[in-house]
Regions:
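Serine-hydrolase catalytic machinery in alpha/beta-hydrolase-like enzymes
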Residues: 27-35, 45-173, 186, 190, ...
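Extracellular low-complexity, Gly/Ser/Thr-rich intrinsically disordered linkers
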Residues: 151-155, 160-162, 288-342
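Sec-dependent N-terminal signal peptides
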Residues: 3-13
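Acidic glycine-/aspartate-rich tracts in secreted/extracellular proteins
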Residues: 41-42, 57-59, 89-92, 96, ...
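Functionally engaged cysteine thiol sites
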Residues: 42-44, 57, 149, 162, ...
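Structural recognition of the beta-strand scaffold that forms the well-ordered cores
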Residues: 33-35, 49-54, 59, 81-87, ...
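A domain-start/cap signature at the N-terminus of enzymes
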Residues: 15-50, 62-82, 134, 148, ...
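The feature captures the conserved acid-bearing segment of alpha/beta-hydrolase catalytic domains
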Residues: 70, 77, 196-284, 291-296
């Protein structure tokens, strides 16, 4: 899930704001971190939900909150949940006159070149290749690999455990956009016992690499019909990388959980969204497929394709433009009730 690189220059350090706190974690001999926002009127007595929000390729933890979702902390206050935003591995791809910030997650598909069972490579022979992350040094990732090689599944698991040890948590949800959606998808497969629901926004896995959980987990996948970065139907992206069709992903999960009932609906908000909900599944699992017939590669309610390629004061050590204010008028209020009702 690669978007064109953003040209950036060194920015001065900023004073941290109090809206989010930055929490360091020592994981696999590295200091990694996440940002956390606690809702207003939080008490130790009442259990609250935890939502892990995962940024996309070239994104940041704060960019996911500020721009990608158009103010996710406001939704945390409205719905009363704790929001945590992990930061993925990043590096600066240096040119002669510039350097560009690159970040990604090891979603277990983008760090591989070939799919199993002789299904071929995840990109075309003439597809562009992308500079590899330092975590992939010494690993035979192949020419098509573009993502991090860190144990990001374990990192996110650590974040969930850490927050549950310090807060009174009721339910846990993992959501992500693009490469972050792929990461949420992978986490659902690896640790379904830790989450009550997963929301994957425009983050379909690479062709032939769709995973299926072995334990029950509720799942929502959202895609934009006109998305040419992670296409939900046409398989081939603009840069000639291959992605699993949305229908295949939901059908494989539906079969795995033996879902017997399907309800279809067309939701007409600002755009027409084709909704499918699968229920009467094993272990009361629910699966939801949402296809925005006019949407592209953005979070619902956001029009800017570059939203999230920024940082806030909490991440002033990252050389990236400051985030601007984006107001999401309908997307978060469309997705979150569906997620919390799984």
């Amino acid at each position: 899930m690669r978007i064109f690189f953003i040209l950036i220059f060194l920015a001065p350090l900023q004073i941290f704001s109090s809206e989010m706190s930055r929490v360091n974690i020592d994981y696999e001999n590295q200091t990694r971190y996440f940002l956390i926002h606690e809702p207003k009127n939080l008490t130790a007595v009442k259990a609250v939900n935890l939502v892990i929000g995962i940024h996309g390729y070239t994104g940041t933890a704060s960019g996911f909150e500020k721009e990608t979702t158009g103010g996710f902390n406001e939704s945390a206050d409205e719905y009363g949940f704790i929001a945590a935003y992990p930061q993925g591995e990043f590096f600066y791809d240096r040119g002669f006159f510039y350097k560009s910030y690159v970040s990604a997650w090891n979603d277990l598909t983008g760090s591989r070149t070939k799919a199993p069972n002789d299904k071929g490579e995840i990109c075309a022979a003439d597809a562009p290749t992308y500079n590899k992350f330092s975590s992939c040094n010494g690993k035979d990732v192949g020419r098509c690999a573009w993502a991090s090689c860190l144990d990001d599944v374990g990192f996110i698991k650590d974040i969930i455990i850490k927050i549950k040890n310090t807060h009174n948590i009721d339910k846990v949800y993992v959501v992500g956009m693009s490469n972050g959606g792929m990461m949420a998808h992978a986490f659902a497969c690896k640790h379904p016992e830790l989450v009550d629901g997963v929301l994957n926004v425009v983050g379909l896995p690479h062709l032939g690499l769709n995973c299926i959980p072995t334990k029950p987990v509720n799942y929502i996948v959202y895609a934009g019909f006109n998305d040419d970065i992670v296409p939900p139907i046409n398989i081939v992206s603009w840069d000639k990388y291959y992605y699993e069709p949305m229908e295949n992903v939901i059908n494989e999960w539906k079969a795995a959980f033996n879902c017997k009932k399907l309800e279809s609906n067309n939701s007409n908000l600002k755009y027409q969204i084709h909704e499918q909900e699968f229920s009467q599944c094993n272990d009361n699992v629910k699966l939801i497929s949402l296809l925005n017939m006019e949407g592209g590669h953005t979070w619902p309610g956001i029009e800017d394709d570059d939203a999230g390629n920024c940082r806030s004061d909490e991440q002033s050590d990252i050389s990236f433009p400051k985030c601007k204010s984006i107001n999401n008028l309908w997307g978060n209020n469309y997705l979150l009730p569906k997620l919390f009702n799984l």
